[in-house]
Amino acid sequence: MRNIHATAVIGSGAVLGEGVEIGPYTVIEDDVVIGDRTVIGPHVHIADGARIGNECRISTGAVLATAPQDLKYAGEKTYLHIGDRTVIRECVTLNRGTKASGKTVVGSDNLIMAYVHAGHDCVIGNHVVIANSVQFGGHCHVGDYVVVGGLAGVHQXVRIGRYAMVGGISRAALDVPPFVMAGGHASFRYEGLNVIGLKRRGFTSEQLGNIRDAYRIIFQSGLLLSKALEAVRNDLPQTPEVVEILDFFASGVYNRKFLKPFNS
């Protein structure tokens, strides 16, 4: 059974799952799909193109699937996809995509805290925690189990690898490879492995050692990046974690530069 407040405005074409709750003065446009048992608070605006999964929680003042903030956008049909069990807190804004990819994607089991903005064509993975007032430019890619500290600004097209942690108030204008900590405003730098986060997620001492060995070569050997990656490829066991690190450095799309070592 759905519970929809009398003051909510629901488009005639909107598809609402079983057990959906919608608070007062919320506006849901026509081309919207909302999964079962999702709870939407008061004064929320969900625009055409939103595809929201099951058991999400969307708080007061959130604005989802509005048009991308991109001068090239010409009104083409695009989407915002949100997975299951994602929590979206107060006044979050998530724009839909542009013709570049057609959609902005937010995965499942995420916590997106108040006043976060994610621009057009962003891809945010699963089990991600984004603290208050983080701002993502368009085309950012955020891997699974990433944590981003409050008030960080993430430049358009930046990639953040899985299990990485970005410190609060950072100016993240460089790609952040998996498993590391990064931070800084005037100088955004590598700050070591995300050891506590990795241990909490069940990484073994052997896995941590393999990751540490790879990043010692990449960030502390003094080698050019291309030579450091070659050394990692040739001199270390090619475990899944090491391969993931190498793949990240090999797969940049927008030619963003990579994170620098803390002593550079």
Curated annotation (Swiss-Prot):
Pathway: Glycolipid biosynthesis; lipid IV(A) biosynthesis; lipid IV(A) from (3R)-3-hydroxytetradecanoyl-[acyl-carrier-protein] and UDP-N-acetyl-alpha-D-glucosamine: step 1/6
Disulfide bonds: none
Protein's name in the database: Acyl-[acyl-carrier-protein]--UDP-N-acetylglucosamine O-acyltransferase
Any one GO MF annotation of this record: acyl-[acyl-carrier-protein]-UDP-N-acetylglucosamine O-acyltransferase activity
Family: Belongs to the transferase hexapeptide repeat family. LpxA subfamily.
Organism: Chlorobaculum tepidum (strain ATCC 49652 / DSM 12025 / NBRC 103806 / TLS)
Keywords: Acyltransferase, Cytoplasm, Lipid A biosynthesis, Lipid biosynthesis, Lipid metabolism, Repeat, Transferase
Its EC number(s): 2.3.1.129
